[in-house]
Amino acid sequence: MNLKLTSINGGLKIEVHENSSQKSGITTGSVATAASVAALLKLVDKAPDIVKITAPTTTLTVEIEDTSFIDNNTARAIVKKPNYNDPDVTRGMEIISEVTLTNNSGVIEITGGDGVGRVTKPGLQIPVGEYAINPVPRKMIKENIMKYLPEDNGAIIKIIIPEGKKIAPKTMNSRLGIIDGISILGTTGIARPMSSKAYTDSLRVQIDVALANGYKDLLFVPGNIGTRIAKEKLVLDEDEIIEMSNFVGYMLEEAHKTGKIRSITLFGHAGKLIKIAAGIFNTKQSVADARREIMTAYAGLVGANKKTLHDIYNCITTEDVIKILDENNITTEVFELIANKIVELCSLKYEGIKFHAVIVKMNGEILTPSHIQNIPFNKK
């Protein structure tokens, strides 16, 4: 599908058509809303091929895959989440809404079914025990349903995601305490690529969960490598581990804003963390890839000769650099110096938080032994 944008009284109208090359899509919240409206229209009017829904600041025209009656008072509709130019695991996923008319005038109840996750930990926008359908999608569903709901009726709306349990392990839900499915998300109705605010917001929620569970000493990792090795080496709870992806600066800034975090241990593979020593707080390779330059500079600071520096500079991977450092018996000295600089820069930039930096190899070897001794987590 693609998105056609036109002006509507200063806002936007977005029409959705098939074309996976588009940069933006629509959120699971918008898909669930469209399916709910279509199911209601099946009951009170006629089955639509498309529906128009109102999202915050936008109007969306969404194609309906199928509608059917379950009984005289209940209908269901299926909407497929459009493809767009992003590695979103929910692209192409079907969302089903089952709408049942009730005699409880004007009262709309929203619940979940198979494939919609349940919240098990505090700190999220939804209370523990509830289905993980976020406030904005709930509001969107209610407001759009009210446009078509007969005056004397209420409605029970059940959202189902057939592939939700299968997709859930590919999302961050388990880290946030959402089990048995995925979440219905969205704040604007439009899904942006993962480099956008929508993605960084999803990372930030981890901080809220950690604080809600009483953790003030947190371990920030770039991704799966850091998480895996931290769990192998340290005694800590899942909620103490915060994934920051490439957005180091954003996540540290958000942590600093809370005013509640005592310490942050930056823990991860050398290829990511060393960039921070050069003041690079977005570690995405296409944004800044100065690994060779950083490693060459720090090797020079500890006295590496010209040939060694030349060899380091011509390496392709950080792991290759480490082999050269090992051959020259300067690995620990180089990485301890880099870790010191990381701590110095972060401490200056985010005052009031105690920082530590632990740099590791792919195989889990600790490259900064003195730093890991000082972190506020027990070692295994």
Curated annotation (Swiss-Prot):
GO terms for biological process: anaerobic cobalamin biosynthetic process; methylation. The keyword rRNA-binding does not apply. Its EC number is 2.1.1.195. GO terms for molecular function: cobalt-precorrin-5B C1-methyltransferase activity. Pathway: Cofactor biosynthesis; adenosylcobalamin biosynthesis; cob(II)yrinate a,c-diamide from sirohydrochlorin (anaerobic route): step 6/10. Keywords: Cobalamin biosynthesis, Methyltransferase, S-adenosyl-L-methionine, Transferase. It catalyses: Co-precorrin-5B + S-adenosyl-L-methionine = Co-precorrin-6A + S-adenosyl-L-homocysteine. Gene3D superfamilies: CbiD-like. Belongs to the CbiD family. This is Cobalt-precorrin-5B C(1)-methyltransferase. The lineage of its organism: Archaea, Methanobacteriati, Methanobacteriota, Methanomada group, Methanobacteria.
